Amino acid sequence: MRILIIEDEQKLGDYLVKGLTESGFVVDLARTGPEGRNLALDGDYDLVVLDVMLPGIDGFAVLETVRKSKAMPVLMLTARDDVADRVRGLQSGADDYLAKPFAFSELLARIQALLRRGRKLHEVSSYTLP
């Protein structure tokens, strides 16, 4: 499974790469909005972990652009935890929203749940009647 992390905070980005790699995922990291948008559009990812506050363009703009052509799950991971931001993220197409600070175990559980749901939807949509 391949995950794209779009996170500008160096320590957190490196921590996520290390933890998710150790959990068996192939992980790419983008540190700006434009870089993340381009990787998400051009790459073949099973899931995106997306920060809101990014240099260049914010995570909401990245999400809206990616949603126009890609259907992979997106988990927004951000320090912006007010209700309006969570609602905006979910209405813009995010599949889940997790506020910083967070426990890595919760992030991993949410990623696994999103990937499970994604696989089930893919299996249903690719099923053909005999």
What spans do the regions from the language model cover?
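CheY-like receiver
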Residues: 118-130
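N-terminal/domain-start alpha-helical segments
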Residues: 1-120
